[in-house]
UniProtKB/Swiss-Prot annotation:
Species this protein is from: Sordaria macrospora (strain ATCC MYA-333 / DSM 997 / K(L3346) / K-hell)
Gene: NOP9
GO cellular component, as recorded: 90S preribosome; nucleolus; preribosome, small subunit precursor
Biological processes, Gene Ontology terms: endonucleolytic cleavage in 5'-ETS of tricistronic rRNA transcript (SSU-rRNA, 5.8S rRNA, LSU-rRNA); endonucleolytic cleavage in ITS1 to separate SSU-rRNA from 5.8S rRNA and LSU-rRNA from tricistronic rRNA transcript (SSU-rRNA, 5.8S rRNA, LSU-rRNA); endonucleolytic cleavage to generate mature 5'-end of SSU-rRNA from (SSU-rRNA, 5.8S rRNA, LSU-rRNA); ribosomal small subunit export from nucleus
Gene3D superfamilies xref list: Leucine-rich Repeat Variant
First-listed, main subcellular location of the protein, grouped into a coarse class: nucleus
Subcellular location: Nucleus, Nucleolus
Protein's UniProt name: Nucleolar protein 9
Sequence segments annotated as region (Disordered): 1-56, 350-372, 712-739
Listed Basic and acidic residues bias regions: 11-44, 350-371, 719-733
Pumilio repeats: 129-164, 165-200, 231-271, 395-430, 432-467, 620-666
C-alpha cells in the first residue's frame, strides 16, 4: 500500500492558509495595541478633576508640564503623577516561533503526554526556546497564556530568571493588555518564596547542565521585588488609575503586606470578573501552602508600603484624592492603600501608645505634635476628624456625605468605617449615621456603608438603631433590603438583644400578614417562576430584571438561614414555615438553586423546636429520591440525610428515622444503573454505600447506625447468633446451667461429672 501523502496543491494551500493566519494575528495585535492606546488616553482624560482646584491633569500625549502649576515646578512634582515614559514595543515573534509557542500552549492545556518524563523534557525544550524571547511572548496576544502557564510550572530559579528578563521594562509590561497578566502571575507565584527564604526553608534547585548562574539567580526574591518597586515608583500616580497597571499595584501591595493570596476577598480585589482563569496540570504541586495563610514578610516590605502610601498622599491634594475615590479604576487601589494604612500603621501606633508608659507631660505633648504633623491618607480624606463631623460645612463631613450615595465612593467609605480608629467611628456614628440610620438603610447604595456601621455598634446604639428601623420594616421588605434585615438580626443575636430580636421578628411577620407560614415561600420566592441554575443563561445575556430577581433570592435565602441559626422564636418561625410547605415546594427548594437547597441542609442540621420537624421535612422528599440524586443541588440534601443519626442523642437533636433511610436506599437501588451513568448519581450511590446495601446488608445497617448514640446503636444492630449467645453467657452467674436443667436426664461421663461436683459441694 502507498503512503498517504499530500499533493503539491494541498501543500501550497496549507502554506497559504498558514500565512493568512499569521497575517490575521499580526493585524489583531496591531489593532489591540492601537485600541489600548485610545483607551488609555480616554482613561487619563476621565481622571481629570476640577481645573480651578489647583490640580492639573496629565495631557493626552503622555508628557507632563510641571510649570503648569501656580506654584511652579516644585508644586508640579508634588501634585502631578509622572506619566513621562515611552511605552516600549518589544517586536513580534516570527511565524515559526509563534506557531511553536501556540502549539506548546495547546499541548500543555490538553496535557496529552505519554509519561511525566516526556512532559518534563518537553518543558525544558520550551524554556530553552523561550530564552531571549520572554518580552515578545508576554506581550503577544496568542502566546501570553503560555507564559502564564509556564510561570505556574516554574521553580524558583526560573522565576528569578524571568524577573531578570522583565527588569527595566516593568512599567511597559504592567500597563500592557496581555503582559500585565503575566507580571501579576509572576508576582503572586513568587510571593511565598520570600517567606521561605526569610525562614531558611528554601533549598536552591540544582542548575541544569550547560546553563550559567546569573546575578538574578544569586539575588534573593526580596531584592528582586524591591528592584521592581524602585522601577515603578516614579510612575505610581499614573499606575493608580491605569486600566492594567492598577491590578499590578494591588497585587504588589497584597504581597508586601503578607496577606493570604488565595482568599476570595483578595482574588476579587486583584482580578476583574472578566479575567480568564488560566491553569495547567501540575500547577497544584508547585503551589505553596503559604498562599492560603498569612505570610511572614521582611521589614523592608513594610517600609515599602509606608513609602507607597506617603508618595500617594504627597503627589495628590485633597481634591485629587476625592476624584480618585470616585474613579472606577483608582477606587479599589485607594481602598487597599487606606486599609493597609489603618490596619498596619494607625492601629499599630495606637497599641504602642497605650502599652508604653509616658515619662512626663512634655514628652507626651511633643509626641502629640509629631503625630498631628504627620500627613496620612486618612487625615487627607477626613481632616480634623472626629471633631469636624459635628459641622456639615467642614471638609470631612462634606467628603462623607458626598460618598454615601455614590456607587463607587461608597465602597471606600465602607473600608473607612470598617477599619478606622474607635474615636473617628464614634464621631461618624454620632453626627452622620446615627440620626438618619433608618433612611440610609432604605437606600440601595447608602445601605452598604450603613450595614458596616451596624457591625460596629455597641449594645445601646444598636438597640437605638433597631428602634428607629422597626417602622421601616415594611419598606425594607417591599424594596428587597433583606441584607439589612439579616444584619439587624445577626447583630442583635451577637449583642444578646433578645427583646430586639423578638421585636424585629414581629415586624417582619406583620409585613407578611402576621403568619409565620408565609416567611419561607415569600423570602425564597417559591410562588414565582425561578429559572434553575443549570438553565440560566450567561450573566452577560441576562436581563436586568432577571439579575435583580436573582439578587433578591440570594439575600432572601441568606435571611432565612440567619433566622434558622438564631435559637428561640426566629428558628421556631422558620421551622414552622418549612414544615407547612407542600411537597412540591420542598422539592423546588431542593433542586432550584444552591441558595435554597442550602437552607434545607441547614434545617436538617438544626435542633428541632417540634419533635417531628425533621421527619416531616424528609417525608416530603421521599417520593422524589431519583430526581434529588441526579440534581446538583438536591444531591447535597440527600447526602446530608444519611449523615444524621436515626435516634437523637438528646431531646430535639437532629435525627431521621431509620426506616426512612432504608426507604431511600431501596429506591436508589432500583435506579442503580441510571445513577451509575452520571457523576452526581455515582457520588450519591457512593455516599450512601449502595454496593454494601446490595451485597452485605447487615454491614450496611451497622454502618448506617454508626451515627446513632451508643446505647441505641448497640441495641438495634442485628448480630450473629454466636455473638448473642456469648454475650448472654457472660451475663449469667458462674455455674449456672439453665432454668430447664434436669440432672436425671444426664448419662455417661456427663452424669459422673455432675455427681462429682455435687459431692464436692
Amino acid at each position: 500500500m502507498g503512503k498517504n501523502r499530500k499533493s503539491k496543491r494541498q501543500l501550497v494551500r496549507d502554506e497559504k492558509r498558514a500565512k493568512k493566519r499569521g497575517l490575521e494575528i499580526e493585524h489583531e495585535e496591531e489593532r489591540d495595541i492601537k485600541k489600548q492606546r485610545r483607551e488609555e488616553e480616554a482613561h487619563q482624560d476621565a481622571f481629570a478633576p476640577v481645573t480651578d482646584a489647583g490640580y492639573v491633569p496629565p495631557p493626552l500625549d503622555g508628557t507632563y508640564d510641571e510649570n503648569a502649576f501656580p506654584g511652579g515646578p516644585e508644586e508640579g512634582r508634588r501634585n502631578g503623577p509622572n506619566t513621562n515614559f515611552e511605552r516600549e514595543f518589544f517586536g513580534m515573534l516570527a511565524e515559526q516561533e509563534q506557531e511553536y509557542f501556540r502549539h506548546a500552549d495547546e499541548l500543555l492545556e490538553l496535557n496529552d503526554f505519554p509519561s511525566t518524563e516526556e512532559r518534563d523534557i518537553f518543558l525544558q525544550n520550551v524554556y530553552k526556546e523561550l530564552r531571549g524571547k520572554e518580552l515578545k511572548v508576554a506581550s503577544s496576544q496568542s502566546c501570553s497564556r503560555l507564559m502564564e502557564r509556564l510561570i505556574l510550572l516554574s521553580n524558583t530559579r526560573q522565576k528569578k530568571s524571568l524577573f531578570d528578563a522583565f527588569g527595566g521594562h516593568f512599567i511597559s509590561l504592567v500597563t500592557h493588555r496581555f503582559a500585565s497578566h503575566c507580571c501579576e502571575k509572576l508576582f503572586l507565584q513568587s510571593a511565598p518564596v520570600v517567606t521561605q527564604e526569610l525562614s531558611g526553608e528554601y533549598e536552591q534547585e540544582p542548575l541544569p547542565e550547560g546553563e550559567e548562574e546569573t546575578e538574578a539567580m544569586k539575588s534573593s526574591m526580596e531584592d528582586l521585588f524591591l528592584l521592581t518597586l524602585d522601577e515603578l515608583e516614579e510612575h505610581l500616580g499614573y499606575l493608580l488609575t491605569d486600566r492594567f497597571g492598577s491590578h499590578a499595584i494591588r497585587a504588589l501591595l497584597v504581597i508586601l503586606s503578607g496577606r493570604p493570596l488565595d482568599q476570595a476577598g483578595t482574588k476579587s480585589m486583584l482580578q476583574s470578573r472578566k479575567k480568564e482563569y488560566i491553569t495547567v496540570e501540575g500547577a497544584a504541586a508547585n503551589q505553596s501552602e503559604l498562599s492560603s495563610q498569612i505570610r511572614a514578610v521582611p521589614s523592608s516590605f513594610t517600609m515599602a508600603i509606608k513609602k507607597i502610601i506617603d508618595d500617594s498622599t504627597m503627589t495628590m491634594d485633597a481634591t485629587a484624592l476625592r476624584v480618585l475615590a470616585k474613579h472606577p479604576t483608582g477606587n479599589p487601589t485607594l481602598q487597599l492603600l487606606l486599609e493597609l494604612e489603618l490596619t498596619m500603621f494607625v492601629k499599630g501606633k495606637e497599641k504602642k501608645e497605650k502599652n508604653k508608659q509616658k515619662k512626663d507631660d512634655e514628652e507626651a505633648e511633643e509626641k502629640k505634635e509629631e503625630t498631628q504633623s504627620e500627613v496620612t491618607l486618612l487625615g487627607m480624606l477626613v481632616p480634623d476628624a472626629p471633631a469636624a463631623f459635628a459641622d456639615n460645612t467642614t471638609q470631612a463631613a462634606e467628603f462623607v456625605n458626598s460618598m454615601i450615595y455614590d456607587p463607587i465612593g461608597s465602597r471606600l467609605l465602607e473600608t473607612l468605617i470598617t477599619h478606622c480608629p474607635g474615636k473617628i467611628f464614634k464621631g461618624l456614628q454620632q453626627h452622620i449615621f446615627g440620626p438618619r440610620i433608618q433612611s440610609l438603610l432604605r437606600n440601595d447604595i447608602a445601605c452598604y456603608p450603613a450595614i458596616k456601621v451596624l457591625n460596629r455598634l455597641s449594645r445601646e446604639d444598636l438597640a437605638d438603631a433597631v428602634e428607629k428601623s422597626l417602622p421601616e420594616m415594611a419598606s425594607f421588605v417591599d424594596k428587597g433590603r433583606f441584607n439589612v434585615i439579616r444584619t439587624l438580626f445577626e447583630r442583635c443575636h451577637i449583642r444578646n438583644g433578645t427583646d430586639e430580636i423578638n421585636a424585629l421578628l414581629k415586624a417582619l411577620t406583620s409585613a407578611y400578614g402576621n403568619d409565620w407560614k408565609k416567611l419561607v415561600p415569600k423570602l425564597c420566592m417559591l410562588d414565582e417562576d425561578v429559572v434553575e441554575e443549570e438553565q440560566k443563561p450567561d450573566p452577560k445575556f441576562q436581563t436586568q430584571e432577571a439579575k435583580n430577581k436573582a439578587f433578591m433570592l440570594n439575600h432572601g435565602c441568606q435571611l432565612v438561614a440567619a433566622l434558622l441559626a438564631i435559637p428561640g422564636q426566629p428558628s421556631k418561625a422558620i421551622q414552622a414555615s418549612l414544615a407547612a410547605l407542600k411537597p412540591a415546594q420542598v422539592m423546588k427548594m431542593a433542586t432550584t438553586s444552591h441558595n435554597t437547597s442550602s437552607i434545607l441542609v441547614k434545617a436538617l442540621q438544626t435542633p428541632a423546636t417540634n419533635p417531628t420537624f425533621h421527619k416531616v421535612l424528609v417525608s416530603s422528599l421521599l417520593p422524589h429520591v431519583y430526581e434529588l440524586a441526579t440534581s446538583q443541588q438536591g444531591s447535597a440534601v440527600l447526602n446530608e440525610i444519611i449523615s444524621l443519626p436515626s435516634k437523637p442523642a438528646e431531646p430535639n437533636a437532629p435525627a431521621v428515622p431509620f426506616h426512612m433511610k432504608e426507604n431511600i436506599i431501596s429506591q436508589l437501588a432500583n435506579y442503580e444503573s441510571e445513577l451509575r451513568e452520571t457523576w452526581l448519581g455515582r457520588n450519591v450511590w457512593r455516599t450512601w454505600k449502595g454496593d454494601m446495601w446490595s451485597h452485605r446488608r447487615h454491614d450496611w445497617v451497622r454502618w448506617a447506625k454508626e451515627t446513632d448514640p451508643e446505647t441505641a446503636r448497640v441495641a438495634a444492630i442485628p448480630r450473629k447468633r454466636e455473638e448473642k449467645e456469648k454475650e448472654e453467657a457472660e451475663k449469667k452467674p458462674k455455674g449456672y446451667l439453665g432454668k430447664n436443667f434436669d440432672p436425671k436426664k444426664l448419662k455417661g461421663f456427663a452424669a459422673k461429672k455432675f455427681e462429682k461436683k455435687e459431692a464436692e459441694a
